[in-house]
Amino acid sequence: MTAAGFNSILCLRQLVRLNRRQYSAPAKSVLSGSQTNDQATPPPTSKSADKMRGWQLHNYGDIDELQLSEMLKIPQIRCSNECLVRIRATAVNPIDLAMLRGYGATVLNKMRCQPGDGIEFPLILGREFCGELVQTGMGVSLPLGSRVWGVVPLQATIGSHAEYVAVPSYCLAPAPKELDDYEAASVLYAGLTAWSGLYITGGLGGPCGATTASGGGAHKRVLVLGGSGGVGTLAIQILKSQKVQVLATCSENAIEMVRNLGADLVVDYNNPQAMEELCKYAPYDIVLDCAGQGGQKAAESKYDFRQYITFSSPLLANIDKQGLGVGALKNVFDLFQTNVRSVTQRGGLVKWGFFSPAPQGIQFLQKLVEQRKLMPLIDSSYGFSELPKAFEKMKSGHLRGKIVVKLREETGD
């Protein structure tokens, strides 16, 4: 990121912080006292204290299916590596909107094989958070009271759109001091999606890039489609931190913002003449589709590439529509057919990228934040009682960064 771009992002950050203060109402404390040991014993001491607020889903459908419940049971730790977190801030991601409509239900229900996880409803959405560690299993070394950031596995029935969440210890880490609660709650889901696509699926840094926090990819050339969204903005910063040449597409009114993130060339995807410029830099080592175009569009590109990685795969949708067996076969056929066209016309492979809650990915992102090479962009912020409005904002599209939701006041730790 350039110095001028970094200063511009800092100015935007200050404006967002000023605008969000009206939503910062403290939530009630439901834990009495503090726990000094690391064993998973029930934290509350009264019947009223073991309850929490959360947004539940009892049927798949539209945003009006979300219901705020005031007396939900706080999740219990069931394994030695689990952690209970009191949430201060969370975020709304495209996957939340998709899961609200039933996306991935067939596969995710099969994955809910632990006792108590096999029930589909009620479902609490939310994939990432920043909060306070209030209880741990005996195998967790993080101290209680730690400020942490983390993600929630997709198959979990209790997500982060509630006051408390329980997750495996590999899904969280100490939150960077460089970020406030809002910012820390907005990094990991999109950041791990971008990191996984580039380093696990794309092999950008070789074997070490996928298995460690080393990163890599210097002097490669990557085209980011949809550079102004949650995944795109973080992908650009990740790539530039590793000395990768980055080109990006976005709408005309987001060009300056994306350029400030460090992209070497930014073009308006609605301008055919500008899009022609991308052909001059081909072939690309990776085309990273953060715009939801899907692999079918790869062969229609006017530029060559070695890999086209899309986060909009039909994998879960095919299984939802046709069942596990037939859907799996349909996935194999779709990927094969897409790659035949892609290799024939553009010379490269199409791959599907996915979110991965890998601890080495969290460590990599944490390192970039601490080095001030990665800063999340906040599109808008909402209070917890306004979560449906946050979903409406997500549904409207054309975001400039992430949508965040605040549950608690910051404590300055």
Swiss-Prot record:
Keyword Nucleotide-binding: yes
GO BP, sorted A to Z: ubiquinone biosynthetic process
A GO CC annotation given for this chain: mitochondrial matrix
Keywords linked to the UniProt accession: Mitochondrion, NADP, Nucleotide-binding, Oxidoreductase, Transit peptide, Ubiquinone biosynthesis
Listed name of the protein: NAD(P)H oxidoreductase RTN4IP1, mitochondrial
UniProt binding sites for NADPH: 228, 230-231, 251, 269, 353, 355, 398, 400
Keyword Chloroplast: no
Organism: Drosophila melanogaster
Positions of transmembrane segments: none
